Amino acid sequence: MSLVESPPWQALKSKYQELSSLHMRDFFAQDKKRGTRLSLEAAGLYFDYSKNRVDEKTIDLLCESANACNLPLRIEQLFSGKLTNESGEMVGFHTALRQVNNFSFKTNNNAIQEIHASWEKIKKLSIRIREGDYKGFTNKSITDIVNIGIGGSSLGPQMAYNALKPYVKAPLRCHFISNLDDTDFYETVRTLNPETTLFIITSKTFTTKETLENERRATEWLMQAAKKENLIQTHFMAVTAAPEKAHEFGIQKDNIFMLWPWVGGRFSVWSAAGLSLAIAIGWEEFFEFLRGAHAMDTHFRQAEFNKNMPILLALLSIWYINFFHAKTQAIIPYSQRLVYLPDYLTQLHMESLGKSVQLDGSAVHWQTGAVVWGDLGTNSQHSFHQLFLQGTMVIPVDFIAVLKNSRESHWQLPLIANCLGQSQTLMEGYDKEGVMRDLINQGIEHEKAEKLATYRLIRGNNPSNTIILEELNPYSLGSLLALYEHKVYVQSVIWNINPFDQWGVERGKHLAKDILQALQAETDQSSFDSSTERLINYVLKIKGNRP
């Protein structure tokens, strides 16, 4: 029986017909404790999902759908290393990277031992660099760490580093290079000193074009200062699942950190792919980061579905995507330190859930995924919230609020007020009675107020979740990221798709190689479609006129 044929799914269709014409204002008017009932705390996070177009029966039916998809079994498979891809290879075992309290796995003991060894290696290097004992080619201590990677190898560490900057030990600084455009590289290193700069090359296969090209630029940049290749070897570290290729590329064996094949790039910040972060904030704080994620893992495994934060977050997304036909979802963090979080979550969602084939190879017959995007509040309020408030689409929003930036900082009351104000306005709207009252109180005549009111109405009934962190620290950040990882995994289980591959991306890389050869006038262009062939010829024409 397919997902859409299951009894809970059919019941959800009827429930959608019932609720689609109702307004959330009425839910709150009829239930004064709705905000209390539809909220929970776990792993250092507070989650309010009361401003959603659901009642308790909806939640029950969504949970029944999850059970019908064998979610309990699939959760245990995630934590036991029993998930495999179409080739039978283990995937999605990133949760093992943060099992900080105990290692009660019945299988994969070798993986656990390797993780422990990796922790020790990360810890030792972090201590050496932070204490100034790791030297460059002129015997000066390292002050700047440049992470070269792309996708999850860059987005995760950069997002976490920016979020945890108050925990970075001066004078250490981290920088992140990912783009093939050489501007990214040269603008980053422009103010750096080659004598005190360490490059961390992160590539699972060590064949990624963008990463290896930037590594070549780094080598050239260092050689201009050091003159001799043997002097710059201490300025490179590698994080990879292909250590032999990294060594062939010139990275010393002792400077190679393991990234296992069963860790996807977008789930890799917990591994040595987070080496730059571990160095910057120190091993103790990095371990807190892992501990926060582990706390959310424990909650995810143990809590009942209707009290389970990741599961509820996922089921609400399913509700809007598959029944309200939402095509997009927004993430709005109200903290400058979370500026890169929307980009990170965009990749996590869209690369994991952008699939049209089920696990058995058959076609998907229901919508999967959505465009996930966002920006910082309050910037976003003056940019695109207008679409949320008076547009015609259903766009679910996750608001993320931080009460205090750190133990020493003041409460972020103005930010919090804006965050909560947006969520309330999205829910209740601004009806004609309220608009007219406010306009008349401003001294506007009734006839003119009638004309103006039409343009100021806000229908409301737009869904949102609010997630609150008491303080943005390594523990709470780890918990927040794990929350969204598990949310995405639950969605993949219900849609019966593989969240751990990205073959569409791989195909694009392959075609880029063919097109590059054509642009270098080395191959026949007849294999390309007429549009691509014409574009190639246009580039060659301009290239011929401009050396």
From Swiss-Prot:
Reactions catalysed according to its record: alpha-D-glucose 6-phosphate = beta-D-fructose 6-phosphate
Gene3D superfamilies listed in its UniProt record: 1.10.1390.10, Glucose-6-phosphate isomerase like protein, domain 1
EC number, as in UniProt: 5.3.1.9
Main location as per UniProt: cytoplasm
NCBIfam families assigned: PRK00179.1 (NF001211)
Record function comment: Catalyzes the reversible isomerization of glucose-6-phosphate to fructose-6-phosphate.
Protein name: Glucose-6-phosphate isomerase
Organism: Coxiella burnetii (strain CbuK_Q154)
Gene designation: pgi
